[in-house]
């Protein structure tokens, strides 16, 4: 039974990292594209747009890091393995 739980934990860890990276990756690409478009339209507000972009990218990246933490806890501190 432990081998099944271990195998399921490895699969779940891979899915956790993979799925946690898809959403923020798409969001970061969209945010960067819109920021470049906004800077191209109004170059005088470049500093304000860049600051907001960097803050929002950090928040989006934190979601991926949370997925990594879940994956590492499943691999190394698995509560389901007896």
UniProtKB/Swiss-Prot annotation:
The UniProt entry, under Gene3D superfamilies, shows: F1F0 ATP synthase subunit C
- Which InterPro entries does the record cross-reference, listed alphabetically? ATP_synth_csu_bac/chlpt (IPR005953), ATP_synth_F0_csu (IPR000454), ATP_synth_F0_csu_DDCD_BS (IPR020537), ATP_synth_F0_csu_sf (IPR038662), ATPase_proteolipid_c-like_dom (IPR002379), F/V-ATP_Csub_sf (IPR035921)
- Segments spanning the bilayer are 7-27, 57-77
Q: Which GO terms describe its molecular function?
A: lipid binding; proton-transporting ATP synthase activity, rotational mechanism
Please give, as recorded in its UniProt entry, the membrane topology of this protein. Multi-pass membrane protein
Keyword ATP-binding listed? The answer is no
Per the annotation, which location comes first and is thus the protein's main one? plastid
User: For site (Reversibly protonated during proton transport), what residue positions does UniProt give?
Assistant: 61
Q: Which GO terms describe its cellular component?
A: chloroplast thylakoid membrane; proton-transporting ATP synthase complex; proton-transporting two-sector ATPase complex, proton-transporting domain
PROSITE patterns annotated for this entry?
Answer: ATPASE_C
**Pfam families in the record, alphabetically?**
ATP-synt_C
Instruction: Give the keywords, sorted.
Output: ATP synthesis, CF(0), Chloroplast, Hydrogen ion transport, Ion transport, Lipid-binding, Membrane, Plastid, Thylakoid, Transmembrane, Transmembrane helix, Transport
Subcellular location field: Plastid, Chloroplast thylakoid membrane
Family per record: Belongs to the ATPase C chain family.
Q: What does this protein do?
A: F(1)F(0) ATP synthase produces ATP from ADP in the presence of a proton or sodium gradient. F-type ATPases consist of two structural domains, F(1) containing the extramembraneous catalytic core and F(0) containing the membrane proton channel, linked together by a central stalk and a peripheral stalk. During catalysis, ATP synthesis in the catalytic domain of F(1) is coupled via a rotary mechanism of the central stalk subunits to proton translocation.
Q: What else is known?
A: In plastids the F-type ATPase is also known as CF(1)CF(0).
Summarize subunit and interaction data from the UniProt record for this chain: F-type ATPases have 2 components, F(1) - the catalytic core - and F(0) - the membrane proton channel. F(1) has five subunits: alpha(3), beta(3), gamma(1), delta(1), epsilon(1). F(0) has four main subunits: a(1), b(1), b'(1) and c(10-14). The alpha and beta chains form an alternating ring which encloses part of the gamma chain. F(1) is attached to F(0) by a central stalk formed by the gamma and epsilon chains, while a peripheral stalk is formed by the delta, b and b' chains.
Name assigned to this protein: ATP synthase subunit c, chloroplastic
Gene that produces this protein: atpH
């Amino acid at each position: 039974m432990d081998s099944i739980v271990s195998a399921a934990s490895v699969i779940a860890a891979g899915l956790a990292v993979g799925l946690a990276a898809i959403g923020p990756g798409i969001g970061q690409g969209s945010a960067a594209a819109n920021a470049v478009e906004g800077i191209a339209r109004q170059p005088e507000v470049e500093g304000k747009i860049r600051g907001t972009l960097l803050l929002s990218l950090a928040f989006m990246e934190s979601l991926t890091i949370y997925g990594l933490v879940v994956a590492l806890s499943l691999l190394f501190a698995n509560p389901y393995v007896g």
